[in-house]
């Protein structure tokens, strides 16, 4: 898959943004993640990262930012601005399926991730000037398998987000709908 990444990045210019919505490295600690961060840094464009569920090396935003190569930015409960685009995000959590029984721990994590996303969106809004666009990053899909609205999509509506980039899903079978439009917002599966 790394060759596919390199091939896809050939269309990216140095002034473009490359958004990586989590699962950045299989490393278990920050030192082991540095080669992967350098690999990402060597790709064209300005890179923005958010944490995924397999990023065990990502213990805290301060330690992550301390080792990031030039041109690579990490967001967690905050946002970063490039010209007229503000990028914000959070890891998110699994959105429940209709009529599914949710575990108490899942409810707790989902609620916490909603708060984190709202903090990030608030930060983004505070960085915005007239005409700026907000792009949100979330590792987990912000909706269930039926693409139903969720508390995450409601937050994106509330903050007038222009687009959302998400990941987490693996394999070709889940890539049937890589772009979904909901309530005027485009959601991109990366």
Question: Which residues fall in each region the model found?
Answer:
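Core catalytic region of metal-dependent phosphoesterases/phosphodiesterases
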Residues: 1-83, 150-161, 183-185, 189
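Conserved catalytic scaffold of divalent metal-dependent phosphoesterases
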Residues: 58-148, 155
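Histidine-centered catalytic micro-motifs
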Residues: 136-143, 162-173
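Acidic, low-complexity terminal tails and accessory targeting/binding regions
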Residues: 166-186, 190
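Short, flexible micro-motifs
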Residues: 25, 55, 92, 169-170
């Amino acid at each position: 898959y790394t060759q596919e990444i390199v091939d896809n990045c050939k269309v990216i210019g140095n002034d473009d943004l490359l958004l990586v919505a989590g699962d950045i490295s299989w490393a278990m600690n920050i030192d082991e993640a540095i080669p992967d961060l350098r690999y990402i840094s060597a790709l064209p464009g300005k890179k923005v990262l958010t944490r995924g569920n397999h990023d065990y090396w990502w213990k805290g935003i301060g330690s992550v930012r301390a080792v990031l190569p030039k041109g690579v930015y990490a967001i967690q409960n905050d946002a970063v601005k490039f010209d007229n685009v503000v990028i914000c995000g959070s890891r998110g959590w699994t959105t429940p399926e209709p009529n599914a029984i949710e575990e108490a721990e899942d409810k707790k994590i989902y609620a916490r991730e909603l708060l984190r996303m709202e903090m990030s969106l608030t930060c983004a809004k505070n960085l915005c000037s007239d005409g700026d666009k907000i792009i949100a990053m979330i590792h987990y899909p912000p909706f269930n398998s039926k693409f139903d609205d969720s508390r995450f999509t409601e937050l994106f509506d509330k903050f007038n987000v222009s687009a959302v980039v998400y990941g987490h899903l693996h394999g070709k079978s889940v890539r049937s709908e890589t772009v979904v439009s909901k309530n005027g917002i485009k959601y991109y599966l990366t």
